């Protein structure tokens, strides 16, 4: 597309375009994480409704042990993500506070990296719950599956998010202090979170050239590995989510 004789207005200082864009980029990255989470919730709703109605071997699917375990794991992932995203939203709402500003700066790219990456296999799992019909357009899930990759790509792909997290940790000492304080507050409550924090500490002690840039956000976003890590989300969002919504912390050790 070409524009002839178009007129524009300079926003910010000349040569400072990237910095101006990045001021907006944090919110749009947060939006990507929220969008992926919403699509995952919709996929889970479709799968759960099907499991409640569909019968196999004399019982509804939801009553079959393996299906109950699968749906429970999917629900844990979603509850953990919800808690984390609420906590991140609070940080964005209170950016005038220095601590909350660092919280938003550090965890926004980590959230985009982890949640957007988790979306594609999550929807694929929901499709399997429905069986063959889950692959057909009538089920709605193929549309959700096609929609998923875009949130991982725009506003910065996975590598960009990883580099951004490393940049924050290396250039803002307050970010590492905040992360240590957050983990100390919930130490001993979940072994998966404790292990992820120990691994991340060891990673950051290595020389910069030995650090895997993608390892750091994966450690920071340790929930990325599966349902047993959902409490890592819940721990981050514990102060905003009421007790009856904190299923991950009660049911996963």
Q: Which sequence ranges carry the predicted segments?
A:
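Internal glycine-rich alpha/beta core junctions
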Residues: 1-199
């Amino acid at each position: 597309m070409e524009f002839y004789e178009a007129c524009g207005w300079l926003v910010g200082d000349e040569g400072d375009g990237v910095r101006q864009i990045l001021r907006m980029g944090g919110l749009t990255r947060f939006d990507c994480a929220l969008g992926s989470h919403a699509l995952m919730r919709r996929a889970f709703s479709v799968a759960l409704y099907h499991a409640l109605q569909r019968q196999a071997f004399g019982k509804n699917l939801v009553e079959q042990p393996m299906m109950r375990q699968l749906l429970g794991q999917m629900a844990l992932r979603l509850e953990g993500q919800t808690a984390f995203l609420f906590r991140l939203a609070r940080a964005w709402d209170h950016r005038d506070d220095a601590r909350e500003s660092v919280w938003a700066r550090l965890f926004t790219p980590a959230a985009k990296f982890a949640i957007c990456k988790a979306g594609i296999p999550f929807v694929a799992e929901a499709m399997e719950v429905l069986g063959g019909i889950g692959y057909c357009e009538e089920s709605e899930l193929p549309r959700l599956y096609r929609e998923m990759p875009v949130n991982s790509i725009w506003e910065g792909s996975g590598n960009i998010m990883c580099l951004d997290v490393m940049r924050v940790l290396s250039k803002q000492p307050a970010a590492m202090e905040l992360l240590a304080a957050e983990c100390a507050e919930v130490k001993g409550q979940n072994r998966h979170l404790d292990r992820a924090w120990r691994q991340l500490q060891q990673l950051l002690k290595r020389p910069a050239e030995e650090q895997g840039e993608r390892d750091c956000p994966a450690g920071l976003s340790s929930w990325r590995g599966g349902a047993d890590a959902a409490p890592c989300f819940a721990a981050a969002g514990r102060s905003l989510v009421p007790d009856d919504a904190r299923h991950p912390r009660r049911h996963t050790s």
